[in-house]
């Protein structure tokens, strides 16, 4: 799951 630009799973 991409969280904004951070790309946190």
Curated annotation (Swiss-Prot):
Its main location: secreted. It comes from the Eukaryota. Keywords: Secreted. GO terms for cellular component: extracellular region. Expressed by the venom gland. It is found in: Secreted. This is Venom peptide 1. It comes from Brotheas amazonicus (Scorpion).
